[in-house]
Amino acid sequence: MQSPYIYPQEFDVIVVGGGHAGTEAALASARMGCKTLLLSHNIETLGQMSCNPSIGGIGKGHLVKEVDAMGGAMALATDEGGIQFRILNSSKGPAVRATRAQADRILYKAAIRRRLENQPNLWLFQQAVDDLMVEGDRVVGAVTQVGIRFRSRTVVLTAGTFLDGKIHVGLNNYAAGRAGDPPAVSLSSRLKELKLPQGRLKTGTPPRIDGRTIDFSKCIEQPGDGMPGGTAGPVPVFSFMGGAIPHPQQMPCWITHTNERTHEIIRSGFDRSPMFTGKIDGVGPRYCPSVEDKINRFADKESHQIFLEPEGLTTHEIYPNGISTSLPFDIQYELVRSMAGMENAHILRPGYAIEYDYFDPRALKTTFETRAIGGLFFAGQINGTTGYEEAAAQGMFAGINAALQCRALGGLPNDHGGAWLPRRDEAYLGVLVDDLITKGVTEPYRMFTSRAEYRLMLREDNADMRLTEKGRELGLVDDARWDAFSRKRDAVSRETERLRSLWVNPHNLPLAEAERVLGKSIEREYNLLDLLRRPDVNYAGLMSLEEGKYANPELAAEAAASDDLAKSVIEQIEITAKYAGYIDLQKTEVERAAHYENLKLPTDLDYLQVSALSFEARQTLARHRPETLGMASRISGITPATVSLLLVHLKKNLWKNTVPLKTTDTSTEKAQA
């Protein structure tokens, strides 16, 4: 038997998988100065959009902006590859406005790969990983399918849908990580040997259509913002650095609809659907259901919107968003052709469902390091999430914490205690991480603005103001981004103070002008910042008062010249002024909750001995072992009364200095089983 080959170079961080989580993890740890190896089964698929050709949306766009604010790649790659951009909820408040882009798959993937190949401290290697090197209770490297052993201090596993993946089309199924790629069966088996809590989930994708066979004249055209027929104004950008990058040619999408005949065709295939015949065990995403699931659950609905989305500028391939399916191909063929404009549609690729392993994120530490194996981090769909954006955010988070752990292990300066943990009031990423590790998942998790209780503070527009300084501290943000951010931050501060210092005297303000700009006359002096807080008053109107007396000539000139910095400064000032009262209330709530939120629970506290709690609560807490009282409060089944009793118990026993500790018997382990 051939002896294993040990690669001569050792690494700080090995990232397994080159999808959206893996690429952001590898880029983050490399930017922080760690020697990073990215292992992918195929270098040609780095950054591949496996399902829909779009980035962003409600909640998801917020995550993309946060990744970008800390120097990540997703937003910049989307700006380079985006062929349609829209601001969703543009008529609503700023907390729920979100950017969404259609992307050219080829351009997006090329943009990601270029960043990977040009990132210092980052090495790429093409080989599937079959095993992990574990010594004691710590990971020390990874083993590829041909037996090459790479040693490292930490490993970030971002396996996507590849772990024991199985594709279903009708009653037929076969092993695959996605269409055209093999599954990671050996790695899945190895992880199961490590006794990590595991389950099965499923997701799906629709059949792809040749656009030359679609009659778009029978469909409704949906242009993007800044396109003819779309919302007026410039085409949006995703990245805070994206203004300098020209978007490629912009393209419309189209809308068609299912109908009663479509629904009859779908129902006729229920007896051969893997979903309804028990062939699929995994639970699918609630908010991106298959078309057969929609027709079954909403039987009274006569029609569903289907969005026809172009896959790119150099292909005729169309992604019909809304008909993800695992029905037999003959049913897919008929249902596609039953919709308006699709009567002669040719399917290029059949739709399918894919089932895969995930691991319970409640078994992770707050850094996404597994509790069972030191140095092993999970990110992406392996944690039970769905979506490119959720994966990218997790990847960056895991990459940061793997790098921080390497710094600590190497005795390097580390101001973050070996971990970076954003709070729920700091970032959507904080909400995502906290939800996963405290609540776990019973279905693929996706982000929504409704999941964030402090969403007025966590807007897309201020992601850089919230996170770029932290990114700079961590070593993630380069000089160009830091300079751009500093100019914006300083300009916002200067202009805010200028508005606060300028006063409008009612005696000098003509009634007609007051009514035009302010909606009514004023009876006393106001500074401009206070006037800007009024709902119907805007910055441009204030600058026009008294023949432009209060205007900032420099900022006005930059805004008139379509300067992105000037516009973002004005937007930031307007939003902050108008929502200052509400934001202050949320900050008060955060401060009130902060003490108990961050109150550390003893790591050796034996919950089964806390007699004041119900037996169910004791079992739940023993199983989850939350790190703080705040985390305990968000565990499913833990009531406010339980939290109060736990707090009383902690105070009482802290005073007595007799907090009951875990005993050496197996009672807690039995409760966890």
UniProtKB/Swiss-Prot annotation:
Ligand binding (FAD): G17, G18, G19, H20, A21, G22
Q: What is its main location?
A: cytoplasm
Cellular component terms, GO, for this chain's entry? cytosol
List locations, semicolon-separated: Cytoplasm
Which NCBIfam families does the protein's record reference? mnmG_gidA
The UniProt similarity line reads: Belongs to the MnmG family.
Q: What is this protein called?
A: tRNA uridine 5-carboxymethylaminomethyl modification enzyme MnmG
- The organism is Polaromonas sp. (strain JS666 / ATCC BAA-500)
Upper classification of the organism: Bacteria, Pseudomonadati, Pseudomonadota, Betaproteobacteria, Burkholderiales
